[in-house]
Amino acid sequence: MPRTDNDSWDITQSVGATALGVAAARAAETESENPLISDPFARIFVEAAGKGMWSIYADPALLTKADDLEPDLRGRLQLMIDFMATRTAFFDEFFLAAADAGVRQVVILAAGLDARSWRLPWPDGTVVYELDQPKVLDFKSTTLREHGAQPKAELVNVPIDLRQDWPKALQEAGFDASRPAVWSAEGLVRYLPAQAQDLLFERIDALSAPGSRLASNVPDSGFTDPDRLARQREDMRRMRAAAAKLVDAEITDFDDLWYPEERTPVDSWLRERGWDVSTATFAELMARYGRSIPQGAQDSMPPTLYVSARRRAG
């Protein structure tokens, strides 16, 4: 179903269901022979949600049937697992580096089923603010506490739609804009219209004291190229049809969730506002972590740029 201006969702619907797909990919990577990451909670989320399109990543029995339906499906699924594994490792390392540098305020925007509050070794005194739709945060917290999990930092849930006045809600929850913070906008930006992207980073910039850090994965150049989009949509259509047969469930059409619009380049925008910025493309990040993109699959993933930044003093 196409997006609307005021749409909302729970964990099994629309954008919320993508969080389960991410969790399923993290579970598959965690349980692989040589995992890049360890997320012991990912499998818990997938099992708590029940059967759905996310099952295809986390159920080895389904993968054995994939080749009979679509020769390229297994490779595409592994590429998605690699994508999520490298993305997760990138953000994990970013957070831990900020913690080592003494930053004790953490803000996770569109937190989804990100379980870093529970699984990363946060230093004493760290406060993690998680922002997302109320139903998404409730599912996560309830599921983890039912399994005896306890956060490894002081966790503050801020249940709010990021299209609303989340800076006000964040500060009312205890966030101190006079102190450095570490921000993440992981798996978020392509689900925002271009104007909403601009507003998001304007708000982050306004709340960031010197020494603050920011990481995000954002649409890269070529994201809106019509020919590339057509190839990606056709590839996704074939994979979605095969996957739907495997799980006997409707598969979300991600084309309906993304906004393929021309956007302000986030890296240059941040540099102009006093941030030191580093970037890596999806292919560069995959290579950094020893993963590769299968031949012929270059267009199956949207062009993505990984951005990490630090706010300079003065």
Swiss-Prot record:
UniProt-listed Gene3D superfamilies: Vaccinia Virus protein VP39
GO molecular-function terms, A-Z: methyltransferase activity
Gene Ontology biological-process annotations: methylation
Keywords of the record: Methyltransferase, S-adenosyl-L-methionine, Transferase
Main EC class the enzyme belongs to: transferase
Coiled-coil zones: none
EC number: 2.1.1.-
Ligand binding (S-adenosyl-L-methionine): 132, 161-162
Stated family: Belongs to the UPF0677 family.
Function as written in the Swiss-Prot or TrEMBL entry: Exhibits S-adenosyl-L-methionine-dependent methyltransferase activity.
PANTHER family from the UniProt entry: S-ADENOSYL-L-METHIONINE-DEPENDENT METHYLTRANSFERASE YKTD-RELATED, S-ADENOSYL-L-METHIONINE-DEPENDENT METHYLTRANSFERASES SUPERFAMILY PROTEIN
Protein name (database record): Putative S-adenosyl-L-methionine-dependent methyltransferase MAP_0256
Annotated organism of origin: Mycolicibacterium paratuberculosis (strain ATCC BAA-968 / K-10)
Lineage of source species: Bacteria, Bacillati, Actinomycetota, Actinomycetes, Mycobacteriales
